[in-house]
From Swiss-Prot:
It comes from Gibberella zeae (strain ATCC MYA-4620 / CBS 123657 / FGSC 9075 / NRRL 31084 / PH-1). Disulfide bonds: none annotated. Belongs to the NUF2 family. One of its GO terms (biological process) is mitotic spindle organization. PANTHER family: KINETOCHORE PROTEIN NUF2, MEMBRALIN/KINETOCHORE PROTEIN NUF2. This is Probable kinetochore protein NUF2. It comes from the Eukaryota. Keywords: Cell cycle, Cell division, Centromere, Chromosome, Coiled coil, Kinetochore, Mitosis, Nucleus.
Length: 462
């Protein structure tokens, strides 16, 4: 017993009688005289008399209800038929034609009319009111409808204002949703392009690193070749000085031999001794000539190696030119990547702002819908609700101004960050340009040194 709900002391019959009395009092308050009802219906363009109200005709009553539905709900046969056809196709599928179109349209019209009358205050509307109308029921329904229309006409300005705001918010939401979809598509495309560009940049950086390693190896080989060339030049100078000394000694020996010839012819033993000496000298000269030939051959091989080195240097120069062109291309690609990244950040920021505005508009729309429902339900307290709405609108305005200021601050912070990143990119670009310029200067110096070495080699060979 402890868990059972508390039972009322008043009997149910008394409660039902009280509710009936309240309903009867409300009906009596809302009930209009027959002539007033007939006059209002005839004013809308439908012929209707007191006799038609007292002895109603189902077709005539349905015509009046159709006019009220068209006036208050914009529900006509043209608007109801497509929706009911789609519903029949969803339910029955291929057998949708089994349900007649008249019954479908009647069901849709009945649902919309019942919703309208429920908003007017009639909760017990049924098909009997359409097909078997009675005098009391028609007077009650028409009285409630006419009072609702009068109230609606008295509040047309407020209703139109809220309706226009709701429509504007709906159109704004639709446009923002479309823009959001477009921006999402663009953002996906830009993400794909960014991934592709990042892959290309990684490939270019790997290739650049490989080229840098190759360039360092070529520089080392060039230094080695230059050292070997200097050693060969030194050896060549030493050999040329030795050859000059030997030729000078040979000339002096020939002169001495010519001077000593008449003295040698005096005796055979002396001649034999002189011959032996001359043979020794001749053998020494031959060995010396052979050594000189060997040195000449070594010099020839060194000149051949110098020619090979010159071809290697020319290939190195071509590779350096290619590297410079590729570096320029990479700089252009880096600039394009930077621009695309900036565009991506801007579009992502725009998409976020659109989403924020969309959420704000949805919240505002829900608030406006709740307010319109409150206006319909609380018609007796208009002034108080208007004051509350003014306070709420001021609060919303303050919130919007605060959000606007916050967004402005965020935009300024983002702009400062973008400017800082642009400055960093410019500094990096200047550093890269300085490195490229220094590399070009080193390359020119090396080219000048190589040309000097080649010119000296040609002079030495000549």
């Amino acid at each position: 017993m402890a868990y059972n709900p508390r039972m009322s002391i008043i009997p149910t019959s008394q409660q039902n009688s009280r509710t009936r009395k309240k309903e009867e009092e409300a009906d009596a308050f809302m009930r209009l005289p027959d002539r007033e009802i007939v006059g209002c219906i005839t004013d809308i363009g439908i012929t209707f008399t007191v006799a038609d109200l007292q002895k109603p005709n189902a077709a005539h009553v349905q015509q009046i209800f159709e006019w009220f539905a068209e006036l208050l709900l914009n529900a006509t046969r043209e608007t109801v038929e497509p929706a009911m056809r789609a519903a029949a196709e969803d339910i029955a599928g291929e057998y949708a034609d089994i349900i007649p179109s008249d019954t479908r349209n009647l069901m849709g019209f009945y649902v919309s009319l019942r919703r309208l009358l429920f908003e007017c205050g009639i909760t017990d509307f049924s098909f009997n009111d359409l097909y078997k109308p009675t005098y009391d029921r028609l007077v009650k329904i028409f009285s409630y409808l006419i009072n609702f229309v009068r109230f609606r006409e008295s509040q047309t300005a407020v209703i139109d204002q809220h309706y226009n705001k709701a429509e504007s918010t709906k159109t704004r939401i639709e446009t923002l949703y479309g823009e959001n979809q477009e921006n999402e598509g663009r953002l996906e495309d830009m993400k794909r392009n960014r991934k592709a560009m990042e892959a290309q940049v990684q490939q270019k950086t790997m290739r650049n690193e490989e080229l840098k390693k190759r360039l360092l190896e070529l520089r080392r080989n060039q230094e080695r070749v230059a050292a070997r060339l200097e050693e060969a030049k030194q050896k060549k100078g030493e050999l040329t000085t030795a050859l000059e000394q030997k030729t000078h000694e040979k000339v002096t020996l020939k002169q001495e031999s010519t001077k000593l010839r008449p003295y040698v012819l005096q005796s055979a033993s002396d001649l034999q001794e002189n011959l032996a000496e001359l043979r020794d000298i001749l053998n020494n000269d031959k060995s010396h000539i052979d050594a000189l030939d060997r040195r000449a051959r070594a010099l020839q091989t060194s000149t051949d190696s110098f020619s090979v080195v010159s071809t290697d240097v020319a290939s190195c120069i071509k590779i350096l030119d290619e590297i410079a062109s590729e570096l320029a291309k990479e700089e252009e690609e880096l600039a394009r990547n930077a621009k695309q990244r900036d565009a991506l950040s801007e579009r992502s920021n725009n998409a976020r702002e659109v989403e924020r505005t969309e959420t704000m508009l949805k919240r505002q729309l829900s608030k406006w819908m709740e307010r319109t429902e409150k206006l319909r339900e609380q018609s007796n307290h208009k002034a108080h609700e208007a004051k509350e709405k003014m306070h709420e609108l001021r609060a919303i305005h303050r919130q919007l101004t605060e959000e606007h200021t916050e967004k402005g601050k965020e935009m300024e912070v983002r702009r400062v960050r973008i400017e800082q990143t642009e400055k960093k990119m410019l500094d990096l670009k200047e550093n890269i340009e300085n490195e490229v310029h220094s590399a070009h200067e080193e390359y020119r110096k090396m080219e000048a040194h190589i040309k000097l070495y080649i010119a000296e080699m040609e002079q030495a060979i000549a």
